């Protein structure tokens, strides 16, 4: 006899068995805190990890067919889930991590960590990701938000993205992806799910690439609070000449806390979980910073992180 795991998601035993047959690892009533860098957030009724791209597509097809709401997660580095139980299924791309190198091109699955992608480039003496080394998150997440750092953006090296639109597998060229500052078509077209990405690099000297990557990591450790759970830079830059971290620091807010959430003492653009933080603490701190920046600079800040409700 079928039972309901959660009335709001209509997940029956039959659906669970079908997902299992698709090759998914399934975790019931799973804590999202175990899957996001912030180490906080509520439970979801089901957390599914397909073991292949085909299994992933079958999973999405089934959830769509059954009318079950879902979210996609990569490495969880840019997500802030609220504290309350969330009513949707979460599907992970983490095992969609295939890599294929063809001369100066690298095709990878959306779930591959960007750090591993950088190491693949290094191993194959390909230059272009030196400033991206240590970028947290998955390839899919980087493409989704056009992640960037130290003057580099994901869009620079993208050639093509393979996506699933809920019916068909489609290919999008660079000019069709709608890249902008921390955005892409995938943010507005929620039915489009990134499966693979192809990057174009150029041949370089392995030692030079390695040394530049080390320099990038050194800068990260010196300037970012990597020793604490966080979701990276919290706010988008509202305009090219407005540095959010500098503005927050000018307000004397470095080290300011609400509950377990704190504005980093190392970089004011980061909010960290200094221990026992709730999502509510982080959200209150975000609003506090927005208010203070608005009062002093007449600038409206937007969050770079994704807030899951």
From Swiss-Prot:
It is found in: Cytoplasm. It holds the Pfam family FAD_binding_4. Its cofactor is FAD. Its EC number is 1.3.1.98. Residues 40-204 form the FAD-binding PCMH-type domain. Belongs to the MurB family. This is UDP-N-acetylenolpyruvoylglucosamine reductase. The gene is murB.
